[in-house]
Amino acid sequence: AYTIAEGLAMVKAVRNNKRVLQVGSQQRSSREFQAAIDMVQNGAIGHIEKIYARVGEPPTPLSLPEMPVPANLNFNQWMGPLNDPKIHYHPDLCPPISLDPEENEKLWGAWRWFQETGNGYTADWGAHMFDIAQAAIGMDGSGPVEFTPKGYNGTQYSTMRYANGIVMTEQPYLEDNPDAQGIKFVGDNGWIEVARGYINCSDQSNIPSDLKNLIEKRPRMMTPEERKKMYEEYMKKLKDSKKKGNDAGNYETSAPHMQNFIDCVRSRENPIAPVEVGCSTNTLCCLQNIARELGRPVKWNPATLSFGNDKEAASHRLYWYQYRNPYSLPYFCK
């Protein structure tokens, strides 16, 4: 979803039509993130006071030069409902993907880095890292109540404040690797760091034994072989724990993310990352970018899904914008 409204419409569409939707928040099916969530929720580091979540840079205005549209591309259809006249074709926006002949994109589509077409790293990696923070502190389906952009009154980083007082800051969590995407939970009795293929804690005895090998690893993307081995080991441990009648925890899963989705299509149960989870995380990312573009704090009521009396924020395109014909947004009433 590019806007808050699109996320809200997706929730209604899924629930009204009794569908099963799994959001691509695959970190929720990753053992290291599940362990971090459990440690936070079980009080391993005490009361959570702040969260550092490094995701990357926000979007910038479209800066790619206009180029001729290839004859085999319907660029008008590719744009969909976007109505910004400044959007023009450049091959980096939509790298070619083809099944016949087979061709995979050689770079990430640059549409995600520009504010006319995407939400930058704020949503690209924020959809993953902010999502884990939301899960750990019990804010699924909800979110922060105030967003303050970087640079406002001299602030060094953008911040998000929850009603319970917890403040999440988009800033580096590793001093020696400031660009590494990941999360650091800081409590009144220690800290937990987690990223893809990495986990650490101020008290390392809290880290499950099957993850001890990740303590010394620097944040990176795990190989498919490592991921497969980790799941096999974890699934065996989970099976053994169930035989003993132990509770595996709210965020544990005995299957990878896509298998979890397939299983839920069959069972009609909610998957590990249902549509409401994706909506609340997307809303958080959009609100951070709205505050950044307005250059001031923005207050949000996650219960009423409104900006209160802030008409400027409510009229921002990242909340809702008028689609161009023939597109419309069902299931959403402005």
Regions found by a protein language model. Give the residues of each.
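Structural motif
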Residues: V40-G43, P70
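Active-site Tyr-X1-5-Lys
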Residues: A13, A35-M39
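Charged, alpha-helical scaffolding/interaction elements associated with membrane systems
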Residues: N16-N17, N42, S267, L294
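Contiguous beta-strand/loop segments that form the cofactor/metal-binding neighborhood of enzyme cores
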Residues: Q34-A35, H47, Y52-E276, N282-K334
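Beta-strand-loop-alpha-helix segment that lines the small-molecule cofactor/substrate pocket
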Residues: A1-S29, G43
